[in-house]
């Protein structure tokens, strides 16, 4: 466990290995790891059960979230709660609560922007060479190369639109983050080690 609180916000291109790297960083530093759990915690805050998130993956795409929970709700509450802005605000509040409570790695969800005024937050963006990203997606989802390329393109498009809309910044632009890393250069574990060293040096841990 590290001395002093640190929050590591990680944005990533789909297929870059970001989830695995985020988990490695959390394990190496002995801190918490939050990904899709943020959505579940946000759901509880506004009275939804975890079953509402059964079909929601790591992509911050509330459009599908609406589809999944629409059948679970009825009455006038639906109109007031079922808005992107409301859900983004609730999720942002959950992110702030977690950051206040503990050191952790937070994957995506505009957490770098939500915590932009927290001087203990370091923001990262992970990319990888295209062939590496395609390979990972083919292996993970058991799809062919053409399908993998389509999934990568559509997922990154959604992530960029979501991030750009809520932050007013540009997703993946180096100016939006403290550090951008191409995972292909060092591999997943090498990248995790590099980031851990960067964090320790930045905060003099």
Regions found by a protein language model. Give the residues of each.
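Pre-Walker A (Motif I) flank of P-loop NTPase domains
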Residues: 3-12, 102
């Amino acid at each position: 466990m590290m001395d002093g609180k640190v929050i590591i916000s990680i944005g990533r291109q789909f297929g870059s290995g970001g989830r695995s790297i985020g988990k490695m960083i959390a394990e190496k530093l002995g801190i918490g790891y939050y990904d899709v759990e943020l959505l579940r915690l946000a759901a509880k805050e506004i009275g939804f059960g975890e079953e509402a998130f059964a079909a929601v993956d790591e992509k911050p795409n509330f459009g599908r979230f609406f589809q999944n929970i629409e059948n679970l709700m009825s009455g006038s509450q639906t109109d007031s709660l079922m808005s992107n802005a409301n859900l983004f605000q609730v999720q942002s509040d959950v992110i702030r609560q977690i950051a206040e409570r503990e050191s952790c790695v937070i994957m995506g969800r505009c957490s770098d922007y939500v915590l932009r005024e927290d001087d203990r937050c370091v923001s990262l963006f992970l990319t990888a060479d295209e062939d590496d990203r395609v390979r990972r997606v083919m292996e993970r989802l058991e799809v062919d190369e053409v399908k993998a390329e389509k999934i990568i393109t559509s997922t990154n498009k959604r992530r960029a639109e979501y991030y750009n809309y809520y932050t007013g910044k540009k997703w993946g632009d180096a100016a939006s983050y403290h550090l951008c890393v191409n995972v292909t250069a060092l591999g997943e574990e090498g990248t995790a080690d590099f980031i851990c060293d960067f964090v320790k040096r930045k905060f003099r841990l």
